[in-house]
């Protein structure tokens, strides 16, 4: 829960410096985000939140994410919605959980067990997430409410085409992930580096699937329903969840390699810096 205990965030200058740097990075990254739709943007905002959760654990990570989102809302003045507000804390919380598992497993004699267990978990997570999304809000009652309250627009988009593209995108996303894991399994000879790479990839995949694709899609639909006084958008009525899901899948499939490429070296820098600081702290305390 607290990876660098006995160091304490509020009593350690080094940890406070890291926290301040990461907080500043969240605001810098938020400036350079690119809007794809009114409820979807491309950014690397998850990286500083992932680093914070990795360094300080899930509890402090969740608090940091909540405070950062609150400050961002107060300074920018956009419409606050609780599902969107959960995303940043969840980035940091997931990072803290994955870091805890990594710490438990990094001294294991064989990382092949981790590889196959994580493979199983990823496959299960993909299947469950996709199933939940495809079943979400597809009942006739919801669509009847939408049809009654909206004049449906003729956007000339075939739902079957959306379904096929979404399915293909998920398959590509999954194959890219599996291919990268397979590369790590075959090429990485150093056990600790292999484990760090595997868990870094797992963290980025979990962030993409849990927060961006699963929660993000549901949040987008619920947000539009919220600002329309409980009425679903006409796009959802016409095309279902695919209209909101497909762009997210495509964006995450394209950005996943970049997320891993950014996160992995930064984790190495953080680990080395804080390990040295913890060693100096321990030696000074003993002396």
Swiss-Prot record:
Organism: Mycoplasma genitalium (strain ATCC 33530 / DSM 19775 / NCTC 10195 / G37)
One Pfam family matching this protein: ECF_trnsprt
GO molecular function, one term: transmembrane transporter activity
UniProt protein name: Uncharacterized protein MG313
Gene3D superfamilies associated with the record: 1.10.1760.20
């Amino acid at each position: 829960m607290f990876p660098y205990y006995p160091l304490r965030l509020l009593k350690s200058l080094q940890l406070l410096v890291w926290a301040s740097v990461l907080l500043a990075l969240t605001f810098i990254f938020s400036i350079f985000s690119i809007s794809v739709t009114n409820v979807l943007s491309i950014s690397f905002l998850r990286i500083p939140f992932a680093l914070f959760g990795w360094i300080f654990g899930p509890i402090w990570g969740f608090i940091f994410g909540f405070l950062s989102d609150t400050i961002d809302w107060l300074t920018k003045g956009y419409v606050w919605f609780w599902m969107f507000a959960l995303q940043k804390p969840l980035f940091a919380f997931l990072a803290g959980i994955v870091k805890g598992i990594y710490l438990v497993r990094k001294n294991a004699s064989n990382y092949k067990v981790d590889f196959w267990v994580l493979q199983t978990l990823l496959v299960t997570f993909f299947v469950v997430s996709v199933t939940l999304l495809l079943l979400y809000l597809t009942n006739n009652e919801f669509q009847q409410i939408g049809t009654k309250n909206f004049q449906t627009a003729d956007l000339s988009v075939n739902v079957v085409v959306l379904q096929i593209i979404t399915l293909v995108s998920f398959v590509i996303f999954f194959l890219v992930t599996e291919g990268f894991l397979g590369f790590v399994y075959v090429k990485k000879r150093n056990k600790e580096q292999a484990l760090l790479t595997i868990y870094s990839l797992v963290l980025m995949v979990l962030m993409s699937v849990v927060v961006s694709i699963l929660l993000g899609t549901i949040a987008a639909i619920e947000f539009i329903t919220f600002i329309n006084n409980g009425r679903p958008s006409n796009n959802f009525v016409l095309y279902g969840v695919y209209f909101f899901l497909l762009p997210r899948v495509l964006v995450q499939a394209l950005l996943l390699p970049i997320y891993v490429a950014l996160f992995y070296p930064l984790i190495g820098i953080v680990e080395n810096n804080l390990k040295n600081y913890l060693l100096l702290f321990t030696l000074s305390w003993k002396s």
